[in-house]
A protein has these predicted regions:
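Short alpha-helical hairpin
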Residues: 37-71
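Short N-terminal amphipathic alpha-helices
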Residues: 57-62, 98-105
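Divalent metal-dependent phosphate-bond-processing catalytic cores, especially two-metal-ion Mg2+/Mn2+ enzymes
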Residues: 2-44, 77-85, 89-102, 114, ...
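Conserved P-loop NTPase mechanochemical-coupling segment
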Residues: 70-73, 78
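Short alpha-helical scaffolding segments that buttress acidic/His motifs in well-ordered protein cores
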Residues: 61-69, 108-115, 156-164, 179-184
Length: 240
């Protein structure tokens, strides 16, 4: 428990060793939206706990991207810093459990941090992938500078576009993609019905959903029946 990025919050390694029994500790941190998280510090701490040494050029780009992901000029109440925080932490726990390779660790954290970077305001339903394509356009100069080459960028682009919620990805051999797609979904449902409704309330406000939050959450669960979780640890994380 040496690496603590929030007061009284244990390290990723500690949580991973006890997962899913340690889920209640993560719930308290994930569900709290009182304090704005330091996404740069959080990302560095998660990488450190994953035994990844972050060199200066990468640190610099990560800091700039963390700052951009902390911007919330449309006052999003769901796709905000707290959603990024949740995806980063849970993805890091899964990466630790699955013993991800070194270069995959920074790739995963980068995707977890930035996958909804330009998801500002209401989704434009008439234009599929609108927010995702905006995110990729903004990300490209940062990511190419220190993180990836063209081949890896194609992989990065594919994974990020597959986070588009209506898209159904039946199978993939990409371990980073499996983690990100699963975590992006289960962080809204793995902490039980009551917490699912709390998160639905935040999303309801953001997308100006006219019906009640129960209807929104039911609709979310209904859509999930068409999708599937790719990892056994994801399924165990959602078990009561």
């Amino acid at each position: 428990m040496k690496n603590i990025f929030e007061y009284s919050f244990p390290s990723i390694r500690y949580l991973a060793l006890r997962w899913p029994k340690s889920k209640h500790l993560v719930k308290k941190y994930v569900m709290s939206n009182q304090k704005k998280p330091d996404l740069f510090k959080l990302s560095l701490c998660c990488l450190k706990d994953l035994n990844y040494h972050c060199k200066y050029p990468i640190r610099k780009s990560l800091k700039l991207l963390s700052k951009k992901c902390s911007e919330n000029y449309t006052y999003n109440s769901y796709h905000d810093q707290h959603h990024f925080k949740s995806v980063i932490v849970i993805s890091s726990i899964f990466a630790n459990i699955l013993s991800l390779k070194n270069n995959e660790k920074i790739f995963l954290i980068l995707l977890a941090l930035t996958h909804d970077m330009n998801h500002q305001g209401r989704r434009i339903l008439s234009t599929p992938y609108y927010q995702e394509l905006k995110t990729l356009k903004k990300l490209k100069p940062y990511v190419f500078k220190h993180f990836v080459n063209y081949k890896i960028w194609i992989r990065f682009k594919r994974i990020l576009l597959n986070t588009y919620f209506p898209k159904i990805v039946n199978s993939t051999d990409d371990i980073v993609e499996k983690i990100l797609l699963d975590v992006d979904i289960i962080c809204s449902m793995m902490f039980g019905h009551i917490n699912g409704l709390i998160l639905s309330k935040r999303l309801k406000h953001e997308i100006k959903f006219e019906k009640n939050r129960e209807e929104l959450y039911k609709g979310f669960l209904s859509l999930l029946e068409k999708k599937k979780l790719h990892l056994d640890i994801s399924k165990k994380s959602c078990a009561r």
